[in-house]
Amino acid sequence: MSECSASTSQLSTFCVNEIPWKLVPQTCDEFSEYEFIDEKYRRLSDVESFVWKWSPCGRYGIDLPGGRDVINQQLRDRMAVFDLHTNKWTLYTMDRGAFEIPRVCFLYWARNDIIGTITLVKDYEAGPDDEIPLKFKQSFFYVSHETQTLVYSGSCKYRTNKTIVASYWYHIFENRRGEPFIDHNNYLWLVFSNGVDSLILLPFIPTSTCFKAKCVSFDMNDIVSQFTGIRVFLDPFVSSHYVPWVYRNDVNFFIRIDSHSFIEEQNRDYGLDPQIDNPETKPHRGVFQLRVNLKDVIEKGEKDAIHAVNPETIETRFNRGDIELWRKISDELRQEHQSIAQHGKMVVVQRWSHFTVDMGLSKKMRTRVADLDARDYCCSHKPRNSSFCCIDLDSERIKAVDALILGTDVVLPHPSGSVFLFRYKENYGMSYCELPFFQPLSLKLKCIQVLKESVEIDPSYYRIKCCLKMQEELEKETAENLCTINIQQ
């Protein structure tokens, strides 16, 4: 097990206003019938805008229109598909198996032309504090780009003995591309969490030898307490409900520890910050990466079960000794949100302040909206912490980026190694740019975009560049005048 910190990470700085933004035309019709979750259950998250799940070839992105909190009745049988070659997104129609409200699922590409979905099967409408049994339905759809349809191909169900609290069950479907976990038998699995103490493994594609769900238990409070040397009581919601981020045989968690994490839940007052100046807990507050080799854990659990008198009583579990990496990747997030996206070995941990999203206006405009004051403050606020960081799960290298981003911006890694920043406006209007300091898109793809006449640069980019140029020339002229005055004196 290695224990290190992110203090040696690279810090790159740029302003997104200085990058050419590509406009993305909206090709679908206008829809107006929406149903909103009650304010008290509302969770602000980056799925209120599109978080594209890229196909293995990298050309297509797919997501559900509407997100978790904004439900469009007329879009229950459709999915949004973004074509990088034409820089357009449209709605593909599903021929059957339409989702019911709340229309939430986990999306992943099983193949270049097959989409898989995982939904939670609820037998009854539970109260916010009820425990829901974790029963899943897995469905597959063939993607026809010629007819812009998703053809239903089959489904199956999985039952477990685990439960999840009803008020946040949908957080098990966080925005991951669906990286498959590879076990000791070379079977592929999708990994989810019940948000408290268990991982649930579902077959990536069910076969005759891989068709049942598996469970792995853990006690995150105990594990983290052993690393910090101080007893902690983690808030699962703040730590993204222990969502597992998979890469090959490993599972990564990104754990947030704040000043409230050292107080038992029943004694917390979230209106106060009791230990902000406590020097004893300060080194242990922040965002930490924890990595466990799940392949070895499962293999050991299965071997123990084989030699047990009652195999069904043996519980596969990981603990402190199974952790291969524990490190701090950023300081404590204060009054900030955190969202995570992944593709392959690249994970983007994004942070943004509460004030940059206008919740009332967001409801009215059907997607997250930042008002002008928030944009102005965000672009002039100094000093700033890094807006996001990219973590290479293979080399463990961290690249921190201060990019002046807002809560309405979504940072997404692409299969090519590029990183995109999508900016959303009302009615899913959007533009995007390729971020510097990362691998650029291939020349072949850029040529395809030019030949298809799909590259349209946002005209506001040129206005901004002109303003910046004028400001630069004015500052230069002022400096020269001051220099001349000093010489004359």
Curated annotation (Swiss-Prot):
Pathway as given in its UniProt record: Protein modification; protein ubiquitination
Known function: Probable substrate recognition component of a CBC (Cul2-ElonginB-ElonginC) E3 ubiquitin-protein ligase complex which mediates the ubiquitination and subsequent proteasomal degradation of target proteins. Ensures germline precursor cell asymmetry by targeting germline proteins for destruction if expressed in non-germline cells. This process also requires elc-1, cul-2, rbx-1 and ubc-2.
A GO BP annotation: protein ubiquitination
Name this protein carries in UniProt: Zinc finger-interacting factor 1
Record annotation: effect of changing residue 447 to F: Prevents interaction with elc-1
Residue runs in coiled coils: none
Keywords: Developmental protein, Ubl conjugation pathway
Subunit description: Probable component of the CBC(zif-1) E3 ubiquitin-protein ligase complex formed of cul-2, elc-1, rbx-1 and zif-1. Interacts with pie-1, pos-1, mex-1, mex-5, mex-6 and elc-1.
Domain of life: Eukaryota
